[in-house]
Amino acid sequence: MTKKLFYYQASNPLNQKQKGSIIADTKQQAHFQLISRGLTHIKLQQNWQFGAKPKNSEISELLNQLATLLQSAIPLKNSLQILQQNCTQIVLNEWLERLLQSIESGLAFSQAIEQQGKYLTQQEIQLIQVGEMTGKLAVVCKKIATHRSQSLALQRKLQKIMLYPSMVLGISLLLTLALLLFIVPQFAEMYSGNNAELPTITAILLSISNFLKQNIGILLFFVLSFFLFYYFYLKRQTWFYQKKNQLISITPIFGTIQKLSRLVNFSQSLQIMLQAGVPLNQALDSFLPRTQTWQTKKTLVNDIVLDKEVRSILQWVSQGYAFSNSVSSDLFPMEAQQMLQIGEQSGKLALMLEHIAENYQEKLNHQIDLLSQMLEPLMMVIIGSLIGIIMMGMYLPIFNMGSVIQ
């Protein structure tokens, strides 16, 4: 039975009003659960929430809460039960319930996660397995949550930077479209009575305006169809994702941000795994795509550069070469390679990876700040150019009125 989300209002044993949400199979079950908590005068209202996929922030928060409960010496099973009782995300709640059922059937926590899959990477599952074996599950969960939070913060920062330019560019395109549809035709009527030859830019603008007026419905249909095609099909295709990454990699600043982000994430993930006691070969292998038990399709390669680099490193390491000698400049710059070499020689590779991540995180932040400072004036130039071209094209015949009158 599909679970449902209910909002409730009730009174606690001290007759204080309580508000919140609860997930249950039926309204009666939700009512019974609230009574078991000691609540009375219960009012329930179902929220028709769709079963949306949990966000990365929700997964990070869940792992953070699990780490806190485990650090408080609460057993794993009880911790998961507490998390499920307080989880108001339907899909995540059902996932926790299946995890509990798998653990009750005798599976280890890491095995249960791998069986259910979906929300944790292979690296994170291996870390949890090591945490179980070493008795440091709480520490491992905390590190995974912290790493996820850092990655999410970077992603949100980039989204925030891109939001304003995207809105400005969208408004400028709408304004340009409005000028071509409503203002330019008025100039066309003004110039239609003259037999003089119009400037090239004016003639082009009048032709574009006339084309838009005659085909605006068809164009809107194709634009809407393209966005629907992109959202529901194109963005899910591996080849499109890879081509998009290749295009970003050759774009100034964006390519640098992509490369630094790849280096920081790889260094942080590898450092966490090595510190947890995962062997280097096994840690590197976790970066390669693999089909898990819950998957019915072949796992897709999200980052071709990283996949190629890790395969190359594994090949050289398996032949006896040092890790620092196996990496290339596509992933680690020369400075970082020297730091890796020092880390290997001193037996502190994990610590050196942490230093590399911190060092290049600063460079990544600098590039993001630089992008933020460049985008605003760039948008102003684009807007000014669009409107300026239209205005110049429309008023150029007036400036050349002498020849037009003749």
Swiss-Prot record:
It is found in: Cell inner membrane. GO terms for biological process: protein secretion by the type II secretion system. Gene3D superfamilies: Type II secretion system (T2SS), domain F. GO terms for cellular component: plasma membrane. It is a multi-pass membrane protein. InterPro entries: GspF/PilC (IPR003004), T2SS_GspF/T4SS_PilC_CS (IPR001992), T2SS_GspF_dom (IPR018076), T2SS_GspF_sf (IPR042094). The keyword Cell inner membrane applies. Keywords: Cell inner membrane, Cell membrane, Membrane, Transmembrane, Transmembrane helix, Transport. The chain crosses the membrane at residues 167-187, 214-234, 379-399. Pfam families: T2SSF. PANTHER family: GENERAL SECRETION PATHWAY PROTEIN, PROTEIN TRANSPORT PROTEIN HOFC HOMOLOG. Belongs to the GSP F family. This is Protein transport protein HofC homolog. It comes from Haemophilus influenzae (strain ATCC 51907 / DSM 11121 / KW20 / Rd). The gene is hofC.
